[in-house]
Amino acid sequence: MATGTGKHKLLSTGPTEPWSIREKLCLASSVMRSGDQNWVSVSRAIKPFAEPGRPPDWFSQKHCASQYSELLETTETPKRKRGEKGEVVETVEDVIVRKLTAERVEELKKVIKETQERYRRLKRDAELIQAGHMDSRLDELCNDIAMKKKLEEEEAEVKRKATDAAYQARQAVKTPPRRLPTVMVRSPVDSASPGGDYPLGDLTPTTMEEATSGVTPGTLPSTPVTSFPGIPDTLPPGSAPLEAPMTPITDDSPQKKMLGQKATPPPSPLLSELLKKGSLLPTSPRLVNESEMPVPPGHLNSTGVLLEVGGVLPMIHGGEIQPTTSAVAASPAASGAPTLSRLLEAGPTQFTTPLPSFTTVASEPPVKLVPPPVESVSQATIVMMPALPAPSSAAAVSTSESGAPVSQPEPCVPLEAVGDPHTVTVSMDSNEISMIINSIKEECFRSGVAEAPGGSKAPSIDGKEDLDLAEKMDIAVSYTGEELDFETVGDIIAIIEDKVDDHPEVLDVAAVEAALSFCEENDDPQSLPGPWEHPIQQERDKPVPLPAPEMTVKQERLDFEESENKGLHDLVDIRDSGVEIKVEPTEPEPGMSGAEIVAGVGPVPSMEPPELRSQDSDEEPRSSAAGDIGEADGSSGKGDERPLSAVKTEASPESMLSPSHGSNLIEDPLEAETQHKFEMSDSLKEESGTIFGSQIKDAPGDDEEEDGVSEAASLEEPKEEDQGEGYLSEMDNEPPVSESDDGFSIHNATLQSHTLADSIPSSPASSQFSVCSEDQEAIQAQKIWKKAIMLVWRAAANHRYANVFLQPVTDDIAPGYHSIVQRPMDLSTIKKNIENGLIRSTAEFQRDIMLMFQNAVMYNSSDHDVYHMAVEMQRDVLEQIQQFLATQLIMQTSESGISAKSLRGRDSTRKQDASEKDSVPMGSPAFLLSLFDGGTRGRRCAIEADMKMKK
């Protein structure tokens, strides 16, 4: 909302027509799906839904963003409600879509009603006509229908032209440093050539019809207009009307034939900006005094001339021309030149440098001379338009019908069957520009200037210098984004490098700037036309080849554990003390289903390395704790093997993970540390093994201190030992199967290891714990856990892709979804289940989160947006859960040694334990992980509560 005002500034450059409700609904739905930051995707998705007759930039990214900001400003932000169970707060996107959907439904109902009325009316008319009652009015009806049709077509045409004109204007405004999207190349035809002598005589007037044909407001920017210096900018009172009688131009003019013979490409477009350099103007051969050109005064009347003054094309009477003005070439494309207005006002006396003289041919009497145009500097105009084609006869210039051949020192442009020999309309694209530039390269280095073909008597004056000067003055090229491509820019740069040596003064600033800005624009991803999903796609797909490192971690773990299983027995005993009997699966949890197979993402990769890392710093407390747990496990012969099953289970979460979504995981820093820590030296392995082994031997001496816990543990041991044996015997095979009663495969073993840490009491032995007058404490602990897990849920619900997973999927949104996905899951359902008590542990929460993402991955194809959203969001949410479990496990480890010793004095122990935890040594893994997790006290309390619940 805050950025809405900034976005509204975009409206000045975008289309101004109002959006239809249908278009707004498409926009809002696309934003709800792709998010309000991804305008590339939003724009691409709704392009097919534009109403007919819309301009090409209607659904541009800026226009979409601007329109959506308008929608946001006109929509009330929904107030956040608190405390209502299972209700997810509606977002602004939902409100907008709901409102527009209702409006669109009403609109469609209205359309249906109108269509039905029209149908009934037409049916009634048809029945009357068939019955013969309307015979007298048939002609009238036909005329009415024809008139209506004609009016509709005219309206559509006017609307289309207005839309095109507005689109062209926007395209021109988009590139303010450059000129209008018109390329004017003026090439002298008559007396403007420095090396040629032109016969002067009668003036042939031009037809005004030809001059004004096709001139509409939409085509004004691209209409070539001949501008006269010295002519007043306003219409004089006696100016000729548009209907002034004119003689049409003859198509077989010798000038045209001569132009056809000398059809070579125009001089380099790199010279256009030299109009701005006032120092070069005095020496220009363009500034020709009228006194040197004897024109019979009788031919100066009724000549139609088009003058461009701010886009208006008034008609100037020929008699208004002053005989002393200088004919200076000025094209609309050069309107940005600072010296142009001064040139128009300046008289010939201000230019002190002598000008090349243009004399008439002495051998022919002046009476016989065929007149050139009244403009002594008549030019052939090339109009290069990237977008709007102009009529071929859009400008009127008088032609010379002189039979005398004229020398043409400058290369001219081929005329391709154009009615007016002085106007050539060329539709520009990048190929033509590059062809012109190639020919320019050849032309620029010709040493001489073409000689007159016979009839011209005056020699060219210093051919090469004249060519340069003529190029400086004659060519005005405007560069637009549409004309430039990489090839063109390369050609321009090549010409620049070549020209620096020969004509350093001829370098064109505009061309260089155009080339540079084109290159800069193409560095900006927004301006490139190609689809921009691919880099994102590649980044998303980068994590895919990661299972290999995970498998190496697994293998190293297995080797490491085989080498020092006794030490790791105790390490895991420390972690899982007091609750290990829950491995016995005779009473599976009521909430668990087969979907749990994919639910467990082990936090253990981020757990074990800190333990190993800090072995040197806290070996003594741990070894004493190991002794205590050894007592709790009992002293039977197989007692050492049982914990190993838990070790092995925790040691291979990646092997469980890789079949379903292991390819989507990204190694976080802790996992990388895991890999390094498992490559520790053999000496450290042996040392830790001997320390833990010696502690186990000392353990059985304190059996007398144990209470009902050890008895309960020993009661349950035979089953668990058998299970551990079965697991150990198959440890080296690929997917080992545990002999569990509920039929889960080894993939569920990781889940069970998590259940050790945070599931509710479910086995008979653990029910003995709950008898110990802790019902009230368990309820309190459950409340605290619920608050803590809701923090994790809220982090997931605030994810940038969460709006896809917030609500249940309906068959309207995804056809056939419920036939493919047997157990749908979404964030609102998970929240409801937490509040209702259906989810009572972190493992169940993680299971349902995983289920939700796996449903999305299963249903959508791998190239679908929702698929990639699910993969990315799954990775982020699982990181949150892993951090939660990591802190939980470390705190459980630090607490378990004391709680296993004396359960009766647990209250005092817990207080003492809490104070110990608050003073964790700075080198310990618990301290590091608390830093990594933010180290908040509330999170710690929540995890303590989780552990209380399970006891």
Curated annotation (Swiss-Prot):
Places the protein is found: Nucleus
Cited Gene3D superfamilies: Bromodomain-like
High-level lineage: Eukaryota, Metazoa, Chordata, Craniata, Vertebrata
Cross-link Glycyl lysine isopeptide (Lys-Gly) (interchain with G-Cter in SUMO1), where in sequence: K554
TM stretches of this protein: none
Assembly with partners or alone: Component of the NuA4 histone acetyltransferase complex which contains the catalytic subunit KAT5/TIP60 and the subunits EP400, TRRAP/PAF400, BRD8/SMAP, EPC1, DMAP1/DNMAP1, RUVBL1/TIP49, RUVBL2, ING3, actin, ACTL6A/BAF53A, MORF4L1/MRG15, MORF4L2/MRGX, MRGBP, YEATS4/GAS41, VPS72/YL1 and MEAF6. Component of a NuA4-related complex which contains EP400, TRRAP/PAF400, SRCAP, BRD8/SMAP, EPC1, DMAP1/DNMAP1, RUVBL1/TIP49, RUVBL2, actin, ACTL6A/BAF53A, VPS72 and YEATS4/GAS41. BRD8 isoform 2 interacts with RXRA/NR2B1 and THRB/ERBA2. Component of a SWR1-like complex.
Protein source organism: Mus musculus (Mouse)
Crosslinked positions (Glycyl lysine isopeptide (Lys-Gly) (interchain with G-Cter in SUMO2)): K542, K554, K582, K648, K685
Major localization listed first in the record, in broad terms: nucleus
Domain Bromo: 779-884
GO biological-process terms attached to the record: cellular response to thyroid hormone stimulus; chromatin organization; positive regulation of DNA-templated transcription; positive regulation of double-strand break repair via homologous recombination; positive regulation of transcription by RNA polymerase II; regulation of apoptotic process; regulation of cell cycle; regulation of double-strand break repair
GO cellular component: mitochondrion; NuA4 histone acetyltransferase complex; nucleosome; Swr1 complex
Residue list for modification Phosphoserine: S456, S460, S652, S694, S710, S714
Keywords of the record: Acetylation, Bromodomain, Chromatin regulator, Coiled coil, Growth regulation, Isopeptide bond, Nucleus, Phosphoprotein, Transcription, Transcription regulation, Ubl conjugation
Name by which UniProt lists this protein: Bromodomain-containing protein 8
Function: May act as a coactivator during transcriptional activation by hormone-activated nuclear receptors (NR). Stimulates transcriptional activation by AR/DHTR, ESR1/NR3A1, RXRA/NR2B1 and THRB/ERBA2. Component of the NuA4 histone acetyltransferase (HAT) complex which is involved in transcriptional activation of select genes principally by acetylation of nucleosomal histones H4 and H2A. This modification may both alter nucleosome - DNA interactions and promote interaction of the modified histones with other proteins which positively regulate transcription.
